Amino acid sequence: FFFAMCHLSLSEKDYPEPELIEGDIVLDESTAFAVVDTKSSGKRRRKREVPGNRIELWNNAVIPYVISDKMGIKGRKVIRKAFRNLARRTCVTFIPKQAYHNDYVKFIAARKGCYSSIGRKGGEQVVSLGDGCLDRGHVIHEIMHALGFFHEHSRFDRDKYVKVLWWNIQRGMERNFLSYSHYPVDSVNEPYDLFSIMHYDNKAFSRNGQDTMQSRKNPYLRFGRHRSLSQVDIKQLTKLYNCPTPPRRSRGFCYNKYSRCSSYAATSDACEKSYEFMKIYCSKACGFC
């Protein structure tokens, strides 16, 4: 996946900058187990294990959310596009946080760019989106982390499909290309997917503009930089969250009843503040379906 370091002039000072692994994953109590690895040279693959620790999923595939007041019009538009893409193709649902929701995601604009925790953490958890992250692909990628997904190229079988060109990687960034043991990366028996929205692109963390990863089958194949879920991504989400097959929603079900819905959704917090009304009359613009 195309990783962009991104910064904003307006920062949300109330949120401390977290320690990150693999560029955009928050290192917390649960993911800390995942980065414990055995000693070996930086150029060899190291398997990482998560003993007795499980990533928590969201109940009934429902994600309560809050969008920061500092998120501008562009950010709100892109977040809602990501909601629509996921809701249309899977059973995942995004609804504004209500008083009875204890666990929820807050989308913020912070100094350190794009990042998310893995899975449901309990209480408020942050998805950070800076200027360079405000496109649909980046937002979906970070939401997928929050849904419980690691990077595709961290899979235990990665080296069968991808060759890592260690000599082209920026010094000190080699740790971003280590692979996990079979657990905690749960591929739910789906094949390795070069076109997953969770896969780095060919030149991720390149020190010289050359490829850092290549397909073993076709070194010239370009991957990463995807803007939408791949078919394998959809299958994995469907299995992980026990979604109905096909998804319970369809394009024909999702529409706006007012011509100004898109404007309301993009320029205000109407989707959140007037949820019951907007759910009925502007469900598509708000990304509720």
Task: Describe each model-derived feature in a short phrase.
Residues F3, K77-R84, S196, V232-K235, ...:
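Amphipathic alpha-helical interface elements that mediate macromolecular binding in regulatory proteins
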Residues F3-K74, K81-R84, T90-C91, S206-D211, ...:
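Disordered inhibitory propeptide/activation segment of secreted metzincin zinc metalloprotease zymogens
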Residues K39-E56, I67-K203:
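Metzincin-family zinc-dependent endopeptidase catalytic domain
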Residues E56-I63, G119-G122, T212-P219, S262:
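Surface-exposed beta-strand-to-loop junctions
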Residues G72-G75, C133, S187, F223-S230, ...:
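Amphipathic alpha-helical protein-protein interaction segments
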Residues S196-I197, R225-H226, Y241-C289:
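Compact disulfide-stabilized, cysteine-rich extracellular microdomains and processed peptide cores
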